[in-house]
Amino acid sequence: MGLAATKTKQRFGLDPRNTTWSNDKSRFGHKYLEKLGWEPGKGLGHASHAMSTHIKVTIKDDTMGLGAKLKKKEKKDEFDSGECAGLDVFQRILGRLNGKEEVIADELEKQRKENIINGKWGIHFVKGEVLSSTWDADTMQLKSYSYDKKEITADDAEDAKVSGKHRDRKSRAKREKSNNAALKEKCRDIDRTRKSKRKEKEQEKEKNREKKHNGKEHKEKEHKEKKDKKDKKEKKEKKEKKEKKEKKHKEKSNKRLRSSDSIDDPEATKPSKKSKTKAADSDNVTRDSMLQPRASAASPPPTISTRLSVRSKWIRQKRAAVMDPKALNEIFMVT
């Protein structure tokens, strides 16, 4: 345990070896064993001279399974070092002293290789062995099984030839069929590709034709619309000119009629003079009315909310200034 290892506190009780329990002769188990013939100091079982010491209990302070360390400590053979480091070197020294250095070195190297192979990926490799039925250990060669050749008669030979020819014919026919089928499939594929290319070309041509046709129609529509607009404008202008001419003609005719009437009836001009005097009088009245104060027979102002009270105050002041003739004379510079 180094300084970097985890620190574990061990707590020992008052009786770690549990001697009080083992020395207590008043318990039921002790009395029952004495009735069966057991005496203190003897071992249990058939052999009474066996070990009678207490069992040692170790505290488990790791996450390994039960018996993991014991399995590692077990030695498979005399060359297995287990957990003890440097034991293989010690065994080589002993072998050198005993004159068996080569044997021990070969055995240790073999064990090292097996440990490397078996420890990889957690897989246990099993070496395959040669079957005894196919390997001859004496001659160190594979066994060869030779069958006795039967005597073949002439008829059998002819039958074999005929059957061989028949097989050859069948194989040729199958090959020819397969070749013909492959050629047919190739021809079909070529025809399909040609047809697809032709269809694509025709579709492209049709699209181009439609585009051209649509473009021409669009241009014709635009040209027609422009012509219609021009015609409408010209018609409007002609109508306006005609209306203006008719108005002028009517005005001229009215003037001529008036002039002819005035020559025939000189008194017809009098009402016009009267109308002029009336218009002048109306102008004078309006100017005087502006200077004169208006009638103050107005109803009392209605109640106004507080929000518009300031604005209504200014409006009243303006109205009062307009109603005052002196203020108006000062404004218009009238003396």
UniProtKB/Swiss-Prot annotation:
Residues 25-71 form the G-patch domain. Residues 183-209 have a biased composition (Basic and acidic residues). SMART domains: G_patch (SM00443). It is found in: Nucleus, Nucleolus. Belongs to the PINX1 family. The gene is PXR1. Residues 155-310 are annotated as: Disordered. One of its GO terms (cellular component) is nucleolus. PROSITE patterns: G_PATCH. This is Protein PXR1. Transmembrane segments: none annotated.
